[in-house]
């Protein structure tokens, strides 16, 4: 790599300063800040390392020359298609290649690899592992051609996080997943096909994904706006205030079209129904 490309490689995004000059955020900084925020989101429930690992590698696919060319073209105002450079598959492929071992089928490490890979790969949209029309989400991401995977992986491991650090994180994440399943039920056997296990695994994967999205979106906002997002610890006492703010926001929205009028009426009915005592109700 030449010096010019080596410098550009670490750039995750570009922005305007004072409307004229560009300033950069390195891929390393973005990944690590996202990982820190993701960790903070789930640390209190014992899943911080799962979230941190997924967020740390989520943008691995950006560590290639093709993405830098796309970023610079978009910044220059050229006609580029958003999302035309695939950057979400690389993390999935890396995690499954590195940590998914067929000999360990049904083990905690297999489940951890899949949960973290899904959370990293779905940060711009969830995907089906087994779609209604066939196909497998992981297999598709493992075999997709022309995504600059090897280039992105090698550059990422050199610039952002080395393999030793990632291996240690994965070991810690596997410990969290094991404790999670021990906590939720004594009747779940992750080595067996079990609907209850699948249910909890789906919830866990979405929880880790939500932390990745929180870290990614928060760091992106802070970089693009130049403003630090204040820490917010809502707690139980904060829900009434948040509910009031939501009601105020909704009340200020226009309600002119028939569909929006219907939506508002449905919301009103739901709010009234929430005041009823607990029980089994029929939707009609």
Task: Place the predicted regions along the sequence by residue.
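Accessory nucleic-acid engagement/destabilization modules that flank
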Residues: 1-249
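Intrinsically disordered, low-complexity segments enriched in small/polar residues
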Residues: 17, 276-277
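Dynamic helix-loop-helix/coil hinge segments at AAA+ ATPase domain boundaries and subdomain interfaces
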Residues: 23-27, 251-262
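A conserved cap/lid and substrate-binding interface adjacent to the catalytic center
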Residues: 239-242, 259, 263
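Pre-Walker A adenine-sensing motif
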Residues: 264-276
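Walker A/P-loop
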Residues: 277-284
């Amino acid at each position: 790599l030449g010096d010019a490309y080596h410098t550009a490689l670490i750039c995750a995004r570009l922005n305007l300063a004072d409307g004229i000059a560009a300033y950069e955020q390195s891929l390393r900084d973005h990944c690590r800040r996202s990982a820190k925020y993701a960790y903070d989101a789930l640390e209190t429930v014992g899943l911080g390392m799962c979230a941190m690992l997924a967020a740390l590698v989520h943008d691995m696919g950006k560590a290639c020359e093709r993405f830098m060319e796309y970023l610079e073209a978009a910044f220059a105002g050229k006609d580029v298609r958003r999302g035309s450079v695939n950057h979400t598959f690389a993390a999935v492929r890396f995690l499954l290649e590195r940590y998914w071992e067929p000999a360990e089928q049904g083990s905690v490490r297999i489940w951890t690899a899949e949960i973290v890979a899904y959370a990293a790969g779905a940060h711009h949209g969830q995907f089906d592992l087994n779609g209604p029309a066939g196909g497998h989400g992981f297999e598709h991401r493992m075999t997709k051609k022309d995504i600059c995977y090897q280039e992105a992986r090698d550059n990422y491991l050199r610039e952002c996080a080395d393999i030793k650090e990632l291996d240690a994180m994965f070991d810690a994440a596997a410990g969290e997943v094991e404790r999670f399943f021990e906590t939720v039920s004594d009747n779940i056997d992750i080595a067996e096909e079990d609907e209850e296990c699948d249910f909890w695994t789906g919830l866990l994967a979405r929880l880790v994904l939500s932390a990745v999205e929180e870290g990614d979106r928060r760091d992106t906002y802070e970089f693009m706006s130049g403003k630090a997002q204040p820490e917010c610890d809502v707690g139980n006492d904060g829900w009434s205030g948040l509910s009031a703010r939501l009601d105020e926001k909704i009340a200020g929205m226009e309600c002119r079209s028939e569909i929006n009028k219907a939506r508002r009426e449905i919301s009103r009915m739901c709010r009234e129904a929430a005041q009823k005592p607990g029980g089994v109700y029929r939707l009609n």
